[in-house]
Each structure stands twice: as C-alpha cells, then as structure tokens.
Amino acid sequence: MITISDAAQAHFVKLLADQPEGTHIRVFVISPGTPSAECGVSYCPPDAVEADDIELEFNGFHAMVDEKSAPFLEDASIDFVTDQLGSQLTLKAPNAKMRKVDADAPLKERIEYVIQSEINPQLASHGGNIMLVDIDEAGIAILQFGGGCNGCSMVDVTLKDGIEKQLLDMFPGELTGVRDVTEHQHGEHSYQ
C-alpha cells in the first residue's frame, strides 16, 4: 500500500524517539477522491488508534491508515530527501484525488483515471484541464478543454502531440483517436 524509503524510516524513528512511548505515525488523506484531496502524515499516539485502522509495520515504528484513506493511498510513497538546500519529507500519492481503477474496468473509467491522475496535473501548471465527454462508436475520445487551455494558441499541439499520443500508447486497440469539442474563446483566462 505505502512504500517508505529507508531514509524516511530512519527519520520517523528519530522523530518518534522524542514522543511518548507507543506513538506511531498516521498517514491520511483529507477529502479523498476529490480534486481538493490533501495527504498528510502526523503523530498517532496510542489513544488515537481506531478499531478499523490498518496497521503497517516498518523498521522501528508502525504507520496507521484509516479505512477511508486506504484505497487512495495505494502506490503512495514517502521519502526523506537531503540536498544542498536542506532536507524534506515528501509524500506522493498518485491515487489521492481519484481511486485507481482495475485493469478490467470499462474503457471510459480507465481513460478518466489517466486524465485525472496524469494529464490534468500536467495541464494544471498552465491553469488548464480536460474532461472526457464521451467515447464514440469509432473509439474516439471526445474531450473538452477548460481553464487556461480554453483559447490557448497551443491547444492543437497539446491535443495531438501530447494527450492523443499518450492515450493511444496507453490504450492500443481500444482507442483510435481524440477529438476536441471545446468552443475555444481566447481571453484573459487563456494561457497563451
């Protein structure tokens, strides 16, 4: 469920040494499965352990995960990185905003998952996003751009060289192309 690097495990052991005996860590997601999902790590004293918590054993401590957060922490990783600027704990949870779908889920659900977990985070750097409207009988994903992508002069390049290429590579034989149905209007909201 959660991978914690050796460096992060050593860091947690050091932090927990200053806490009351029996204190572990809690890894959680606030508003899981939503665009505003936030992940966190906190101390978990013995009296804060819930009956339905999932207990993960690590080197010198345990990590508690509440039942509601668990599916959104699949494939999560925690690392402790040190560089010339200092050190920091990093938590990456690719499924926090949307639960990972099974490989045999309907094509629409699998494409929606890729859009939310991989494509939209890239477009967000320009204030943009895309939404899957439908998949037609010919296997073409109908997409609609929003935010900074609406009216952007580079939208065709983003669509064909970025999004379409990525989706066709991920869904060969199932998807035949993508089509933009956005009524683009260049304005102050547009990226370029």
From Swiss-Prot:
Residues given in the record as [4Fe-4S] cluster binding sites: 149, 152
Keywords: 4Fe-4S, Iron, Iron-sulfur, Metal-binding
UniProt record, GO biological process: iron-sulfur cluster assembly; protein maturation
UniProt remark on cofactor binding: Binds 1 [4Fe-4S] cluster per subunit. The cluster is presumably bound at the interface of two monomers.
GO MF term (any one): iron ion binding
Keyword Iron in annotation: yes
Cofactor requirements of the protein: [4Fe-4S] cluster
Function description: Involved in iron-sulfur cluster biogenesis. Binds a 4Fe-4S cluster, can transfer this cluster to apoproteins, and thereby intervenes in the maturation of Fe/S proteins. Could also act as a scaffold/chaperone for damaged Fe/S proteins.
Subunit annotation: Homodimer.
The family this protein is said to belong to: Belongs to the NfuA family.
Xref: NCBIfam families: PRK11190.1, YhgI_GntY
Stored PANTHER family: FE_S BIOGENESIS PROTEIN NFUA (PTHR11178:SF51), IRON-SULFUR CLUSTER SCAFFOLD PROTEIN NFU-RELATED (PTHR11178)
Protein name listed in UniProt: Fe/S biogenesis protein NfuA
Organism (species): Shewanella loihica (strain ATCC BAA-1088 / PV-4)
Taxonomic lineage from the root: Bacteria, Pseudomonadati, Pseudomonadota, Gammaproteobacteria, Alteromonadales
